[in-house]
Amino acid sequence: MTSLFPHQKAKALKPNSRRPAKELCSECGLCDTYYIHYVKEACAFITQQIDTLEEQAHQRSRNLDNPDELYFGVHQDMIAAKKQQPIAGAQWTGIVSSIAIEMLNHGLVEGVVCVQNSKEDRFQPMPVIARTPEEILAARVNKPTLSPNLSILEQVEKSGMKRLLVIGVGCQIQALRAVEKKLGLEKLYVLGTPCVDNVTRAGLQKFLETTSRSPETVVHYEFMQDFRIHFKHEDGSIEKVPFFGLKTNQLKDVFAPSCMSCFDYVNSLADLVVGYMGAPFGWQWILVRNDTGKEMLDLVQNQLDTQPVMSEGNRQEAVQQGISAYDKGVTLPMWVAKIMGVVIDKIGPKGLEYARFSIDSHFTRNYLFVKRNHPEKLAAHVPEFAKRIVGQYKLPE
């Protein structure tokens, strides 16, 4: 049998071996397959090429003079939504799971790449190709640790599947788009989630033990629009910890270096993005990037309550103050942090302005990280849209 592609002669890296991106590796899984053949072009942390891949995925790159596209990328539509009948046990209301199930049930795809957890550890990601609704539901709830989603790409090619849905985050999707034409698929659908600040499993443990009152019972957590981290516990209770009460001086080294050098918070290359940060509290935020994304969303439209996105407040002063506070590792007493959280929740940015606040805060932090730790990569690694966003603020040296 003759190989169609040179990657089929390549060999995956062995577990725990040094990765081509070195300390910036996000463990996306590409190097765990023979697609490592393309790693120099595909890896988001070796070759940043969001604008080129936007053209490939959406037939155009973002308009940098359009304020919404500058921040949120190419899109046809942007709405807030929630399921009329939420899926039990879902992190939000279950929109991502519902779309995946409908695509499978309608025969649009033969499999769904998603992430379950290992039987031994609910926070240990286990990528799978789901072929039934039950297998999709077993993957509900975000996994806050680095996850090798693309490690199953060899299985996809060898299975003979021709129509596939991949659910993933920005760094995974950049690598996926870079090798998309080598997968032998007739149709690839990409459902993305926004993503920042993932951790290793050990880093997650440190974060939980430093921040939660009961780290051993945390089921999942999220940094929410009310400026608090919401920890959901096994008994169903929600623990809320204000952002401003985080022990920043102890947590600076927790987040993965890849996440500290990432500028694709909003998953620019997915067909459809489902998150929460641009929506009012209790709603999810949906970005339809292209016609394929619209096709996916249309499958569940009758299951959703929707409303237009909104924007309120001004983020810029809070972002500027936060740059210095984070850089100095300032930690407030919890009683002060709680008061600040209440006040900022009342008068602070909401909706799309909260999303811009979060993007600005992370991009300025990440720009400084790259500048200080990988200055030789700064010019090429930071996309033009991120440079414009960061350029609004005064940064420390």
Swiss-Prot record:
Molecular function (GO) terms for this protein are: oxidoreductase activity, acting on CH or CH2 groups, with an iron-sulfur protein as acceptor
| Highest taxon above the source species | Bacteria
Can you say what this protein is called?
Uncharacterized protein all1601
The organism of origin for this protein: Nostoc sp. (strain PCC 7120 / SAG 25.82 / UTEX 2576)
Lineage, highest ranks first = Bacteria, Bacillati, Cyanobacteriota, Cyanophyceae, Nostocales
